[in-house]
């Protein structure tokens, strides 16, 4: 059994280089919610050195809210914004001897694309028109994953061990009770449930089936790095091999 571990980098958390020793895919902020040219360059350089797959992490242009405020924008604006951010990271990756392998939207853009076909199609169209060989990372069982596959893109289904799930497979909004799971033992158990058993317990009690192909490790917080290491060690102890998704192993972006 295999699983990919990914982390969102270049967001000012300070543990990016160390996290790259634990993950197999890196989603690098493109400056619209956090980070900037220098942070992007650092993260790309480290990823190239460590053999970690490079991904773009585009968002709404919303640094004031860290890209977490939902926005209602025309499809053309979303398309252009994603294209702009892909171009910026791609240029830096090329200069550092790497290339982008995948794209994972950030924050509100991620969540809205997961449920809104218009937003999903706008993001997918930008990725496809930029480079149809790119894979996309999206919430397991989401509208975004379906839209990517419909467009002929490779889609990698993502799960979150430290986030609460609703019965429909969506994430509990951060503003609601049960959105974040702080108990480390519970998070470890949920990770194994999702990776080995392909299911997660919703906040309402039901078991929700899902296809876990990559697990997001959050790098913020004082103990995040040590906990990320615990998750990787628990997976390996359970006989799960931690590798980049098959669609990224063909040499794209590594």
UniProtKB/Swiss-Prot annotation:
Protein keywords: ATP-binding, Hydrolase, Nucleotide-binding
Which EC numbers characterise this protein's activity in its record? 3.5.2.9
Catalysed reaction, written as an equation: 5-oxo-L-proline + ATP + 2 H2O = L-glutamate + ADP + phosphate + H(+)
Q: InterPro entries, from UniProt?
A: Glyco_hydro/deAcase_b/a-brl (IPR011330), LamB/YcsF/PxpA-like (IPR005501)
State the Gene Ontology terms under molecular function. 5-oxoprolinase (ATP-hydrolyzing) activity; ATP binding
From the UniProt record, give one GO term of the biological process aspect: carbohydrate metabolic process
Q: Say what the protein does.
A: Catalyzes the cleavage of 5-oxoproline to form L-glutamate coupled to the hydrolysis of ATP to ADP and inorganic phosphate.
Q: How does it assemble?
A: Forms a complex composed of PxpA, PxpB and PxpC.
What name does this protein carry? 5-oxoprolinase subunit A
Its source organism is Burkholderia multivorans (strain ATCC 17616 / 249)
